[in-house]
């Protein structure tokens, strides 16, 4: 009888400890999520969002961090009418789509809502793409008067190279204009995404998330992880 009573006491104590641990873990998760979102807000992450959209964007980010913590990734909400992220930072960047056809100029056109928020003009002057059966693909684009050679005699699948190189060109143009936002890439292939961040925002977000394939990366680091050819300009 005493043995049964002792076992019951042990079971009850274990249940109490487990419940207390879950409560503490939930509390820590809540604190971490609020701290993360508050820091993003402090760093100006939501400053381009419409005033009425900011609360829902913060809530969406809170829920992501509460659920996944540092194993998660950045998230956003989309305007149903324009299909543009309400924070004006986040975009899908499918490597296959960017590489093929007019994917490069199409991407620049897709990013125009953010450029408008930054108060900068990123204008395509010309775009040319030539394929040679022996030499491969050659692609040039002129942005704000500057010619960028994206590909020269390129014979591989450029699902990684195309997003990385056009992002590099855009970043150079933003830097010329004195804009402190630049493109960082997340994941790759058909799951690729890009996000505009300041260096300070990126430093904080990079340190918070653990998975290198789910957090925003500078272009050279992203290229190494995705095993792309290095930047050529």
Where does each model-flagged region fall?
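Positively charged n-region of N-terminal signal peptides that target proteins for export
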Residues: 1-4
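Sec-dependent N-terminal signal peptides
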Residues: 6-10
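Contiguous interface-forming segments/domains that mediate binding rather than catalysis
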Residues: 12, 16-233
